[in-house]
Amino acid sequence: MPIITLPDGSQRQFDNPVSTMEVAQSIGPGLAKATIAGRVNGNRVDACDLIEEDASLEIITVKDEVDGLEIVRHSCAHLLGHALKQLYPQAKMAIGPTIDNGFYYDIDLDESLTQDDLEKIEKRMKELAKTKYEVVKKKVSWQEARDTFESRGEPYKVEILDENVSRDDRPGLYHHEEYIDMCRGPHVPNMGFCQHFTLMNVAGAYWRGNSDNKMLQRIYGTAFHDKKALKAHLTRLEEAAKRDHRKLGKQLDLFHMQQEAPGMVFWHHNGWSIFRDLEVFVRSKLDEYGYQEVKGPLIMDRVLWERSGHWDKYADAMFTTSSENREYALKPMNCPGHVQIFNQGLKSYRDLPLRMAEFGSCHRNEPSGALHGIMRVRGFTQDDAHIFCTESQIQEEVTNCIKMVYDTYQTFGFDNIVVKLSTRPEKRVGSDEIWDQSEEALKQSLESMEIPYEIQEGEGAFYGPKIEFTLYDCLDRAWQCGTVQLDFNLPGRLGATYVGENNERLVPVMIHRAILGSLERFIGILIEEYAGFFPTWLAPEQVILMNITDKQSDYVQEVVQKLQKSGIRAKADLRNEKIGFKIREHTLKRVPYMLVVGDQEMEAGEIAVRTRKGKDLGKFKVDDFIAYIQDEISIRKLNLEE
C-alpha cells in the first residue's frame, strides 16, 4: 500500500503498486492527458512504471520545459528509427540520443542520404505520429533482448548489449508498433506528444566516435512542445546561419582555413586588426588589475610534461617532435611554463600575490571531425593568467578575477552570464581543510558581489574547485569562456615554493584564470554576436571616404591622411563609380562610417557623414569628426548612433 507524496506535500495512499499515470488519473483527467513521465524520489521513470513502495513523486507533463521536452525529443529519435525502418528496411540502427536543442540517430546504410531523403523520412514520421499510437514498454532479460535484436538483424544493438549492459540487467524494449528500440527511457506514453518536429541535416559519424570504426550516417532533428516554439527555433537557426562566422569571415576578408593546415587560422589583415585590438584591450585590463605579462616557450621537453602530469593525461592531444634524441611537445597550455618562471629566484610571502599573464600560443591535436571554423581549432591563443598566492589571499584574488571577467564582458555587451561553482570530487589532492577554505572563499567572492550561481557538486578538478562563466549571445546561445580555477597540485609537482613569515618553505596556491578563453574562438563569437557590425573601436575599417567626381580626389586623399595620422583606420574609394554603388558596397563590408565629399563639402572644408545603417549624421568639419570618432573609439562605445 504505497503512500505517494506530491510536490505540494499532499499524500495519496493506494492499495496496490501504482504508476505515475494512475496517480495522475486519480488527480484528474486533464493532468493524466498531459502526463509524459514521472520523477520518483528524484529519478525519472516511464508513466507506466509501477511504484511499489512509499515515494515522492513529481509528475512530468508536456509543459515541463526541461525534462518534458527532453523526453519528447528522445521519443522523436525513436520515431525517426520507426520511419527509417519502414522506408529502409536494410538500415542497421545504432544509437539515437538527445542533444542540445534536438536529437539524432546514427544508422548504417549503404545508400547515402540526401536532403530530399530527409524530407521523405520526415513526411513518414509525421504520418506515423498523426496516428498517436501507444508506445509499449517491456522489461526483458538480457538474453531475450539480445535474441530480439539478433533476430531483427541489428548488430549495433547486439554489440551494445554485449559490451555495455550487465547480464543481470533487464533492458527496456520500447515497441513502436512493429518497430522495437532499446533504451533506459523514459519515453512518451503515445506519439500524440510528438507532433512538432523537423529533420535538420545528415552528416558522417564514426561508430562510438572512434575513427578506426565504420563511418555511419547521423541524422539530426529537433522537436518542441508546440508549433510556435518550433517556428521560433527555426527562425533563430536561420538568423544564426546568416551570422555564421565562417561565411562572414570570407565576406569581410577576415581569415581563411585550408586543408594544408587543418585547424590553423590564416589571419588576413582585417581579421588580424581585430585580433590586435583585442590584445590591446586585454593588456589595458592586465595593467589595471596588476598583472605582469610574460612569454614562455612554444616547445618544451617531454620530461617537463611528465613532471607536470600532462603527459599522462594529454599525450594523445599533444603535437610532438624530436631532436638530438630528445622528445618535445608543443604546449597545449601555459601553466607549466609559468611555474618555471615563478621558480626563477627566491620568492617571499612579501612577493605574493604574483599575477602572471600571457597571450600563449597553444596547440592541441583535436579530432578533425571536431574542428569548426575558428571556434574549434588546433592552434589558438589563450588570454591566460596564473596567480601565485597564499591561502589567506585566495578570496581577494578570486574576487578581483571575477570583477575583471564582468568588466571585460560588459565592454562587449554580454550581460547575460551564468555562473557555476564546481566543488570537490571524490578523488582529489589537498586536505579537507584547504578544500573547505577554498570553496568557502569562492562562495564568499561571488556572494560579496551579489552574483547568483549554481553549485555543481563533485564537478571540480581533482586539484581544486573552480568557477565557470558562461555568456549568452543575442541568439540565446551559451558560450563557456571564462574560468577561475584553484590548483593545489601543480605548484608542488613542479617545485614552486616561497619563504613564509616564519622562514619556512611553503607551496603557493595557484589560480588559473582565463577571461576570453581562446582569442580565436572569442573573435568567432563576436563575429556572430555583431553579425559583422563591429563597434567602431574593433572594426578593421572604421571610415571610408568617397568622392562624387574626380574633382574631389585630392581633397579626399588629404582628409584620409589626416584621419590616419589621428589613429583612425580610414581609406579612400576614388573609383569612377556612382556614389550609390559605392555606398552599397561598403555597407556590405560593415564599415561604420561612410564619408561623402562633393563640391560643396570640399569648398567648405567639410565631410558628409552617414552610418552603415543609413543614418545621416549631417556635415562635419574634419577636425570635429576626428574628435567625434576618437571619443567613440577611446571609450570603446558599443553601439553606433544609428
UniProtKB/Swiss-Prot annotation:
CDD domains for the chain: TGS_ThrRS, ThrRS_anticodon, ThrRS_core
Molecular function (Gene Ontology), one example: metal ion binding
GO terms under cellular component: cytosol
Region described as Catalytic: spans on this chain: 244-535
Subcellular location: Cytoplasm
Cofactor: Zn(2+)
EC code(s) of this entry: 6.1.1.3
Cofactor note: Binds 1 zinc ion per subunit.
Family: Belongs to the class-II aminoacyl-tRNA synthetase family.
Task of the protein: Catalyzes the attachment of threonine to tRNA(Thr) in a two-step reaction: L-threonine is first activated by ATP to form Thr-AMP and then transferred to the acceptor end of tRNA(Thr). Also edits incorrectly charged L-seryl-tRNA(Thr).
Protein name: Threonine--tRNA ligase
